[in-house]
Swiss-Prot record:
This protein's name: Protein SlyX homolog
Species whose genome carries this gene: Pseudoalteromonas translucida (strain TAC 125)
Homology family: Belongs to the SlyX family.
InterPro entries: SlyX (IPR007236)
Residue segments, region Disordered: 49-71
Cited HAMAP family: SlyX (MF_00715)
Disulfide bonds: none
């Protein structure tokens, strides 16, 4: 086998390895994107619940809370 053929085989092997690595990384990115979307939705739901909780608690009593007993 001459040098050019050997170098060509090495390059083909490297390209094949890089293609496999790219496929693995793409799969990992998909998983992370799905997880990020899920976390974003959970954050939005929690923000909505906090707003609802704050608005319902402010509606329940318009008077300021009395100071704690130790004052």
């Amino acid at each position: 086998m001459n040098t050019i053929e050997h170098r060509l085989m090495e390059l083909e092997a490297k390209v094949a390895f890089q293609d496999e690595t790219i496929d693995i990384l793409n799969d990992e990115i998909k998983v992370h994107q799905q997880l990020l979307a899920k976390m974003k939705r959970q954050t939005e739901l929690l923000a909505e619940k906090i707003k609802e909780s704050q608005s319902s608690s402010s509606m329940m009593s318009n008077e300021p809370e009395p100071p704690p007993p130790h004052y």
